[in-house]
């Protein structure tokens, strides 16, 4: 089996290269929408199993990180027709950039995420690895993407405000988790909030995760915990293999 992934680089994403790893006996074919290539359209996406958007670096003023109405319609059509959307965020979330400006919030009808909070989770004792910002997850809800997974590490992670419908929490923070807000560097308790959710949109599927560094970090990335198996499960589920 070959999984075909297209990685968007045309919206100032932090993740500029999809991880190179072994997916058992299966193969990964990865192509890119380069920085100056866009805009995203349906014809560009339709032959791929998964569209990956890795941590858009939102700005208040610039246009390069925003999604146009036509791009949104193309992504909706792609997912609605059976495509997979894999969206990751990170510390700082959507930088409080509103939906009307074209931030990643515009994808909410597919992802179920209305807001990516502007800051970083600081986990409580026994729920982080080495540093409070390296979220250590040992309790995951049952789902095909968590099958066989006992431990996931998510560095530099934000959390979500989600819609009430058609979205399912897969990973949440501990009851004593804090959040460091980027706007003023204040830290306050947030309790149990979602940091990984899945959703289905017509014939397609979406996975949204509040961390991107778990895909690229040297010390707390794919080699940490069961992160490689977790990524493998995500790819297979988004491709309707599980």
Where are these regions (language model features)?
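An acidic, glycine-rich "communication" segment
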Residues: 1-2, 10, 92-185
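Conserved beta-strand segments of alpha/beta enzyme cores
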Residues: 29-31, 114, 168-169, 205
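Short C-terminal domain-edge/linker segments immediately following a structured domain
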Residues: 34-38, 82-86, 117-121, 236-242
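Hydrophobic/aromatic beta-strand patches that form the interior of the parallel beta-sheet core
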Residues: 86, 170-173, 207-209
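Short, Lys/Arg-enriched charge-dense amphipathic segments
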Residues: 17-20, 24, 37, 55-62, ...
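Helical hinge/lid and interdomain linker segments adjacent to catalytic or ligand-binding clefts
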Residues: 3-6, 10, 14-105, 110
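Extracellular ligand-binding/catalytic regions of CAZymes and related secreted enzymes
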Residues: 1-9, 13-15, 35, 43, ...
């Amino acid at each position: 089996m070959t999984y075909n992934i297209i990685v968007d680089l045309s919206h100032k994403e932090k993740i500029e290269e999809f991880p190179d790893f072994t997916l058992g006996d299966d193969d990964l074919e990865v192509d890119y929408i380069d920085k100056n290539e866009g805009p995203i359209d349906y014809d560009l996406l339709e032959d791929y199993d998964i569209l990956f958007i890795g941590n858009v670096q939102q700005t208040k003023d610039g246009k390069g990180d925003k999604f146009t109405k036509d791009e949104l319609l193309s992504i909706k059509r792609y997912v609605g027709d059976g495509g997979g959307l894999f969206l990751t965020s990170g510390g700082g979330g959507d930088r409080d950039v509103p939906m009307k400006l074209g931030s990643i919030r515009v994808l909410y009808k597919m992802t179920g995420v209305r807001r990516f909070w502007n800051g970083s989770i600081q986990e409580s004792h026994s729920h982080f690895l080495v540093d409070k910002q390296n979220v250590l997850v040992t309790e995951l809800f049952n789902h095909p993407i968590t099958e066989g997974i006992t431990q996931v590490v998510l560095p530099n992670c934000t959390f979500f405000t989600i819609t009430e419908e058609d979205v399912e929490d897969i990973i949440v923070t501990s009851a004593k988790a804090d959040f460091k807000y980027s706007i003023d560097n204040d830290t306050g308790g947030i309790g149990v909030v979602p940091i990984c959710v899945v959703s289905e949109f017509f014939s397609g599927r979406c996975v949204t995760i509040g961390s991107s560094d778990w895909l690229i970090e040297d010390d707390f990335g794919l080699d940490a915990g069961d992160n490689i198996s977790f990524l493998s499960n995500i790819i297979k589920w988004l491709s309707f293999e599980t």
